[in-house]
């Protein structure tokens, strides 16, 4: 955890450039895409409730991969790995849990509180920010959680179908959050970046 959280001072120029481009990408999405995506989702699911199954049961279930389903998946890998003496499966489960704690539990939570962005369902616009005021839309915690797990799986199991499946499921978590009015597109993009970076960093550090 300490290694990942203290990584920025060790970044080289290329890594800082990449981070700058990522930040610009999030700002660009916020300015250009957030409103059209929100309007489209409202037309598709105007009365959608994120807490109960609705007309789109599929997205309701996919959203849970940003919380309990992915934890169950990691638990399954750990148990199966321990029973079958599969060190990679055990390491993947451990790295996945560590990445969730760092990406979703620490970085995302702290950023949410500091930024204080209102959610789409609050209907106050895309640029309503109250730092430390209670609003917590940016970034998406479900998405950072899901992408942290996807990144860990993809970095442990280097098969194309595994990578595609992992990131596809994580992406659908983001779609579900937008569908349910929980997040703007830029919230989801930022969460995906955080989760992916943290997952990759945790795996690389523990393999080194």
Positions of PLM-derived features:
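Interfacial segments of alpha-helical transmembrane regions
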Residues: 15, 19-20, 82-107
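Alpha-helical transmembrane segments of integral membrane proteins
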Residues: 61, 68, 72, 95-96, ...
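Small-polar-interrupted transmembrane alpha-helices in polytopic inner-membrane proteins
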Residues: 76, 97-114, 165-177
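Alpha-helical transmembrane segments of multipass membrane proteins
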Residues: 25-26, 30, 34, 103-108, ...
């Amino acid at each position: 955890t300490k290694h990942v959280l203290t990584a920025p001072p060790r970044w080289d120029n290329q890594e800082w450039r990449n981070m700058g481009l990522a930040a610009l990408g999030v700002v660009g999405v916020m300015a250009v895409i957030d409103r059209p995506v929100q309007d489209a989702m409202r037309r598709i699911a105007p009365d959608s409730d994120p807490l109960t199954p609705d007309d789109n049961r599929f997205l309701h279930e996919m959203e849970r991969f940003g919380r309990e389903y992915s934890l169950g998946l990691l638990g399954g890998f750990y148990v199966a790995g321990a029973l079958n003496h599969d060190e990679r499966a055990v390491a993947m489960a451990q790295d996945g849990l560590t990445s969730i704690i760092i990406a979703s539990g620490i970085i995302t939570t702290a950023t949410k509180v500091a930024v204080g962005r209102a959610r789409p369902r609050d209907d106050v616009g895309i640029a309503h920010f109250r730092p430390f005021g209670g609003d917590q839309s940016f970034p998406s915690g479900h998405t950072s959680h899901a992408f942290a797990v996807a990144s860990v799986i993809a970095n442990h199991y280097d098969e194309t179908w595994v990578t595609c499946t992992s990131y596809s499921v994580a992406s659908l978590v983001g779609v579900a959050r937008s569908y349910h009015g929980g997040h703007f597109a830029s919230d989801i993009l930022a969460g995906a970046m955080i989760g992916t970076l943290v997952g990759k960093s945790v795996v690389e550090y523990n393999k080194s």
